[in-house]
């Protein structure tokens, strides 16, 4: 309730964020708690984003598509139902292969996402706890090696789709007149 009743209104009042992002994972926020937080954020003009399906699939990717989240991050254990929901909701799947590498975890089912029509972005997920990697070249290599994306698909994932994951594809992400 602190988030919904005090923090989100303060963020709106101060104009310090464009997005409301929640970590939907066992032991953090449930899918229902995440829904309430994201919908409240939307009421305050904040676009929804969600970190989901990193360790366990508890409904976060399904929620992302259902509410039309701008993006869903991690998605290491994203189930087919989550992929279908993100495809129908227009959610960008922001996959973080360096996190899988450093955790020794599985890799997100990116080929299933691509085949379902989910736009895939890739990023580093730099943080001191699970991914001490700032190297986008490494992320690009993992995209080709572990996600089995073509170089063209990886380039799109780290440019245009990366821009889409922050709702800026109309302004940046490609080299063309007007951008």
Label each region the model flagged:
Residues 1-58:
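Metal-coordinating catalytic core of metallo-dependent amide/deamination hydrolases
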Residues 47, 57-171:
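Active-site-adjacent C-terminal substructures of enzyme catalytic domains
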């Amino acid at each position: 309730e602190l988030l919904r009743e005090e923090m989100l209104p303060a963020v709106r009042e101060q104009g310090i964020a464009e997005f409301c992002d929640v970590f939907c994972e066992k032991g953090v926020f449930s899918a229902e708690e995440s829904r309430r937080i994201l919908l409240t954020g939307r009421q305050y003009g904040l676009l929804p984003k969600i970190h989901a399906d990193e360790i366990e699939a508890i409904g976060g990717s399904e929620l992302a598509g259902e509410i039309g989240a701008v993006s869903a991050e991690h998605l290491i254990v994203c189930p087919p139902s989550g992929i279908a929901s993100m495809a129908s909701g227009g959610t960008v799947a922001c996959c973080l292969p360096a996190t899988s590498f450093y955790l020794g975890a599985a890799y997100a089912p990116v080929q299933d996402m691509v085949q379902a029509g989910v736009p895939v972005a890739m990023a580093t997920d730099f943080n001191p706890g699970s991914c001490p990697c700032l190297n986008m070249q490494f992320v690009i290599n993992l995209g080709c090696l572990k996600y089995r994306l073509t170089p063209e698909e990886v380039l799109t994932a780290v440019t245009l789709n990366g821009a889409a994951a922050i709702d800026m594809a109309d302004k940046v992400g490609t080299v063309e007149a007007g951008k």
